[in-house]
Amino acid sequence: MLIGIRISEVWFGVITLFPEMLKSVTDFGVVGKAIKQSSIEVCTWNPRDYATDNYRTVDDRPYGGGPGMLMKVGPLEAALNAAKSVAPAGSKVVYLSPQGRRLDQALARSALSVPGLILLCGRYEGIDERLIEDEVDEEWSLGDFVLSGGEIAAMAIIDSVSRLAPGVLGHNESAEQDSFENSLLDCPHYTRPEIYRDKRVPEVLLSGNHEKIRRWRLEQSLLRTLQRRPDLLEQRELSEEEAQIIQELRRGQLISET
């Protein structure tokens, strides 16, 4: 666990498989100096420390097939509970995801209004959707590009928020501008167990019907993009199938999960 001296200005908890990565921001520069001066505090929790098997397994295969692995809910939930037990009351849990609200100066400044941030760093293909639904308050993103994990985003958030805290800098600095690629947001993902907190994995992902699974994932992807980032659709050349699904969504037709 990486710990600075506990103070009330800015508190960060980071759930990560690679806590050592955080040293590149906590040991150097503005953030490192602020930690030494007790202006901010950064703590980390590693889900591997909460795995229950001898191999300290933290990932599993996704239901419905597909490439890659998902982070298991058990170790993540235990790490989150450990973080919450020491976080200031009223802290927010933020999942670092390309589907989230884009980080900008206004969002960084708004973080100063909450007692603390617990930053959840994904790896592999992401984390089980049910944990996001039950435990995450907000999703934040650096932009429309893919990273290998949430650690770089966590470091960017720690740096951008810390520099706005009283006494850390003498003045505010402008946020860097990012350039983006047009893409659709991802669909929900699920891994074992099949039932978690009385929530079942969508039946279509258990069907073994690859065409139905492909269609469901496309529908969910388009729905999320339409709801969360409609600007991406304006810049995207839709296929005939995508255009048809968008029309159905805009007419208010429900997407089947079976």
From Swiss-Prot:
EC code: 2.1.1.228
Protein location: Cytoplasm
Coiled coil: none
This protein's UniProt keywords: Cytoplasm, Methyltransferase, S-adenosyl-L-methionine, Transferase, tRNA processing
GO molecular function per UniProt: tRNA (guanine(37)-N1)-methyltransferase activity
Main location: cytoplasm
Function: Specifically methylates guanosine-37 in various tRNAs.
The name this protein goes by in its record: tRNA (guanine-N(1)-)-methyltransferase
